[in-house]
């Protein structure tokens, strides 16, 4: 079956000149042909993601066209404006895939609003809402290595597509022949027919205004003298982040030169992920050279941001996603109360795998904190619920431990642009009162306890990877562990049982241990890996770290 599909591809006059030579190179290599053609990339709520190359199990123009035809079939049943917003990041062929998607939509009579240059996830979410679109498409593979690309699909609210809608689109994709079942005109024809238009300056300006309206202490950054090092990690963050920082008065910014401009090969780091040290290393070195107060790095699609803070002894320390989430929550709450801008009955939303320290901080400020499943769409879902009740202004902040933050309802996905603005404003504020981010973080730990949150990952590559992951998760359910690292399990929460959790079904297990530590086990939604999340609480960092190490060691044989 897969051999036949391979031969069909080989017989085509393929429009992408890279694909035929690639197919010829694997001739006779059964394992390689099977990997590329035995299955197709699956379309889920996060859309598509895969390695670039020829085949149904790879990202290429034909897979993008087929996916877009499936999306178009769904859009045509939705009424409304019959419009889709499209954007893309700096990855290899992102601009090509975005134009291919626009061309297929136009061939189906659907209007398109596409950015004329790369713009990040939050800008796509905003444009989807601004133009009252039926859907949005963002061409990106987020922080994956350079060989990957992807295709994120958004619903009319600017939130990642719902499970139900994604299932319909996937069914339509499966019914569509990858070569003969797709309607197609050229991008130029779509423009000529008036079906494809570029996103206007009015939309871009409204996006920046919506972000800048969420300053906690407007004008403060202009006079604080904050010194910043910033890296867009060769992605799409450069223009929007620098625009907003300049607008709020953060002007002493040094950009990491090797990572300034878009480059989908990500030559300075193999994994452009602001969670890891290697991606931030150049920025950290530059921060030390320039004696910066703060270093920021946004990922390629600028929906996540990592930071390093200057410590009193002049060294720099990476701040985790959980710590930044708690710092921003604390800063937003304290600042809004001080300025009289806190709404009545404010709501904060975090994922179930994010730190319980946020619960303690929210309680201190009298803020309702809601915990939702992993994936920012669930935070967007909470905002949508508030909006439906006419209470959208109650939402003040949402975050995930994986470095994603949002501080307003203007978009429905994580936004590294507003996060960068608020982190800089927060740093400027603490600088202006003779404090620092580091000092405030230590004060928070002193007040609430020394929480430690760590994430480990176990990778399962290849065609059998997903089966191995499923087998491990089933094994944990069939034979529940009674202890980890000598700590007895006091409670198991299985999120596949919505009747017990009150949340939609999800493949997540949470183990509560004696003493209050927790271990979370869940397969990644976008990569072939199982993630383990540890939360430990000690009298100091060393005690919390020692417990985490014990727990992690005990899990290795279970997940190997």
Where are these regions (language model features)?
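Phosphate-binding and adjacent anionic-ligand microenvironments
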Residues: 288, 292-294, 315-317, 335-522, ...
